Amino acid sequence: SRVGQHPYDSAHVILPEIMKDNGYTTGMFGKWAGGYEGSVSTPDKRGIDEYYGYVCQYQAHLYYPNFLNRYSKSKGDKEVVRITLEDNIQHPQHGEGYEKRTQYSADMIHQTALEWIDSQNGKQPFFGVFTYTLPHAELVQPEDSILQYYKEKFTEDKDWISPHWSRYNTSLHAHAQFAAMVTRLDTYVGEVLAKLKEKGFDKNTLVIFTSDNGPHMEGGADPDFFGHNAILRGTKRQTHEGGVRVPFIAWGPGMVPAGVVNDHQLAFYDLMPTFCELAGVEDYVAQYTNPNKEVDYFDGLSFAKTLTGKEGQQAHDFLYWEFEETDQVAVRMGDWKMVSKAGKPHLYDLSKDVHEDNDIA
């Protein structure tokens, strides 16, 4: 099935379920990549108390979609429901006329997330997952001051004209669009932090900002124009460092030492044990292992010690990646990185060759 549509296995617990089970109210805002509408794995069935965003992956690749999805007990929802964007559907979903749509999903999702933070009373702990998609293609957004700034800055820009087979709509001033989307996301993050401070939650809240992959090239995106990803080789869908190494920024006044750069190697499956440790969930593996399953996927290691500036951090023996669509596999052990393409191995010493140019296999 399409990536992001296949449901999470309901026999295996996921992080929001653990947090909810341990007294947290949970919210998620953005793209849900754990199951299609009506499947066994939608936000309402997986430990999420409040949800607003995309469950349909097709709509998730449009910023002026036909509909979004919502699950809100406070609004009387019994399950995930569709919220039709009435203004948008008055105009075509693709091609000429799409630019007349006005309901910009990224702004709508972000405002709902801010309202959710604002609704917290400070008595019950909260766990929020904000899966914003900016600056993923398609590269379109409102004609506001953010976009106008970059249109004036990039006087020689390019248009990306959508081919007939693409899911993405045409992007005019594609460089300006991409830069403005990054700035828009930065603005969102600033507003989230400001809301936490306004509510008095900033001294007792951990915020992590990260990404799911390296830069993409579709829909008019031009990573070469923007310096690619600095000294790293590769892009999204590749197992070179540029495809799998991503920004990871932690903010938590009084908890996370400020201004520290750390080279600890981690993967997203380390988030579950880390959050469990910080939330005081004891022996989560024993608690949440399914006795009816031969295998449970608790592969992570808590990096709470690294986050809080303490000694004794446990490290992975290795990290592993694969991407079946490009027939690429990679394994990293310390500074050694093996990348396999179509079965042929390539070996790099990242301590001397972070761009992965010198194959010593």
Functional labels for PLM-detected ranges:
Residues V40-D44, E311-G312, V329-A330:
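Short glycine-biased active-site loop of nucleotidyltransferases that positions the nucleotide triphosphate
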Residues M28, V207-F209, H346:
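Residue-level marker for buried hydrophobic side chains located in beta-strands
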Residues P16, W116-D118, D327-V339, H346-L347:
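Short, surface-exposed beta-strand/loop micro-motifs that present aromatic residues
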Residues L15, K31, L271, F303:
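Short active-site alpha-helical segment characteristic of glycosyltransferases
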Residues S1-M28, E37-G38, P43-E50, A60, ...:
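Active-site segment of extracytoplasmic enzymes that catalyze sulfate/phosphate-ester chemistry
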Residues G34, G38, V55-M272, C276-Y297, ...:
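Active-site-proximal cap/lid insertion segments
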Residues K20-G23, T308-Q314:
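Basic phosphate/pyrophosphate-binding loop/patch that engages nucleotide-derived ligands
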Residues Q5-Y8, K236-E241, K310, L319-E322, ...:
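Short Gly/Pro-enriched turn/cap motifs at secondary-structure boundaries
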